[in-house]
Amino acid sequence: MGCCSSDCFVYFILSIALAFMAISTTLRSPPDSEPTIPIAFSSSSPSLSLNASNTLRQSNFKAIATLLHISPEIFLSSSPNTTLFAIEDASFFNTSSLHPLFLKQLLHYHTLPLMLSMDDLLKKPQGTCLPTLLHHKSVQISTVNQESRTAEVNHVRITHPDMFLGDSLVIHGVIGPFSPLQPHSDHLIHTPLCQSDTTNKTSNNEEVPVSIDWTRIVQLLSSNGFVPFAIGLHSVLNRIVNDHNHHKNLTGVTILATPNLVSLSSASPFLYEVVRHHILVQRLTYKDFASMSDKATVKTLDPYQDLTITRRNVNSSGGDFMISGVEIVDPDMFSSSNFVIHGISHTLEIPHV
């Protein structure tokens, strides 16, 4: 009975939200919306949405399951093929304070007008941008690991790949929303800068790995007050370059420069571990970090140690964030087309060091 009561409560609350959404839409369009061109539902559409909704509910994605059951046209009316990234309930209910218009924007931002299974996503190069149902807004495949068969979109982990695979609909579960939520902003959705806009391409539109100027990075660090970190990086540079060469899709790096290396000497066996923990395998400006959601992760040269973005207010965006417990105190100190250096407050901790 308790489970039923919980489901009924979810159904009731979302029904009210959808009612307000429908009424509000007739009065005013949100800033980033565009007219929806409906397509005719096939005879299989009702059963498709019902089957997908049941699958979501069984996997405890009850909020999205209810929305898909009550109003499938939100997700399925704009394209014959659809990929939906379902937000887990705990994160989804953090959106309860959003205006219904912006809630609809958020749902459209998590819906793609094409079918992409997990296999399809894993075949995409890191940095690939994908269109969404939200006008002029794209999401980015920020991390791809074919060995572990994991992927992240906008630095948000896909926790339930291929949760539903239908003839025209694919659903993946994600741990949180693809954008920080700003209930009082006229521009709710913050999209990533696509690497496809800034990186070199082959004639087949594939990303070309770049050569990182490590010597220049060491010189910049050394001449601007980060001597211990510069010495540490120089001491293990051969191993760092080897790491770089193993990332065939690497198009840039981010250096999180710490003012000290917790007294590690160049002979310390942990120096290499600490240094590579401070190097991210993509170029991220301060603005890129500020656009990330709470609990988003970023990859380092250490394949077993990701860094996590945390926010004091999960519904905020901007500079109120930390990276695995440290703050960026000197953002965008130095920047080139393939690297950026940020000064951080103190050395990142590594669990096993």
Curated annotation (Swiss-Prot):
It is found in: Secreted. One of its GO terms (cellular component) is extracellular region. Its main location: secreted. Glycans are attached at residues 51, 81, 94, 200, 249, 315. InterPro entries: FAS1_dom_sf, FAS1_domain, Fasciclin-like_AGP. It comes from the Eukaryota. Residues 83-181, 254-352 form the FAS1 domain. Disulfide bonds: none annotated. Gene3D superfamilies: FAS1 domain. It holds the Pfam family Fasciclin. Residues 1-28 form the signal peptide. Keywords: Glycoprotein, Proteoglycan, Repeat, Secreted, Signal. SUPFAM superfamilies: FAS1 domain. May be a cell surface adhesion protein. Belongs to the fasciclin-like AGP family. This is Fasciclin-like arabinogalactan protein 21. It comes from Arabidopsis thaliana (Mouse-ear cress).
